[in-house]
């Protein structure tokens, strides 16, 4: 099931803009202190580095991703999630707007 709405959170008003505007996100904080980000990646192939482990949840569009140390591109679409280890990196290839929630930790 795709997350369509997130209630009861605090939203950081200023956007995080990466890769010359190809990725734009906003941080959200839940009442228990849990942090996530919601955003969109526009058509591009990008490499992201992680500090903490991440789960990427697709809420619209599609992508292909490749985890560090692997050679295979894996498709991910609406309703799909993929996990990225902490202190790692992943490549993401997007041909249409990819809307996501990034779950940290």
Swiss-Prot record:
InterPro entries: Ppnp, RmlC-like_jellyroll, RmlC_Cupin_sf. Gene3D superfamilies: Jelly Rolls (2.60.120.10). It catalyses: a purine D-ribonucleoside + phosphate = a purine nucleobase + alpha-D-ribose 1-phosphate; adenosine + phosphate = alpha-D-ribose 1-phosphate + adenine; cytidine + phosphate = cytosine + alpha-D-ribose 1-phosphate; guanosine + phosphate = alpha-D-ribose 1-phosphate + guanine. SUPFAM superfamilies: RmlC-like cupins. The keyword Transferase applies. It is an enzyme of class 2 (transferase). It comes from the Bacteria. Its EC number is 2.4.2.1, 2.4.2.2. The keyword Glycosyltransferase applies. One of its GO terms (molecular function) is purine-nucleoside phosphorylase activity. GO terms for cellular component: cytosol. Keywords: Glycosyltransferase, Transferase. Belongs to the nucleoside phosphorylase PpnP family. Catalyzes the phosphorolysis of diverse nucleosides, yielding D-ribose 1-phosphate and the respective free bases. Can use uridine, adenosine, guanosine, cytidine, thymidine, inosine and xanthosine as substrates. Also catalyzes the reverse reactions. This is Pyrimidine/purine nucleoside phosphorylase.
């Amino acid at each position: 099931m795709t997350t369509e709405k997130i209630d009861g959170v605090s939203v950081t008003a200023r956007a995080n803009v990466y890769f010359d505007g190809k990725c734009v996100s906003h941080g959200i904080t839940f009442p228990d202190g849990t942090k996530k980000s919601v955003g969109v990646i526009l058509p591009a192939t990008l490499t992201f580095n992680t500090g903490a482990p991440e789960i990427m949840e697709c809420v619209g569009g599609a992508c292909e991703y490749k985890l560090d140390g692997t050679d295979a591109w894996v498709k991910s679409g609406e309703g799909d999630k993929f996990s990225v280890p902490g202190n790692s990196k992943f490549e993401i290839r997007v041909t249409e707007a990819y809307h996501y929630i990034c779950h940290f930790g």
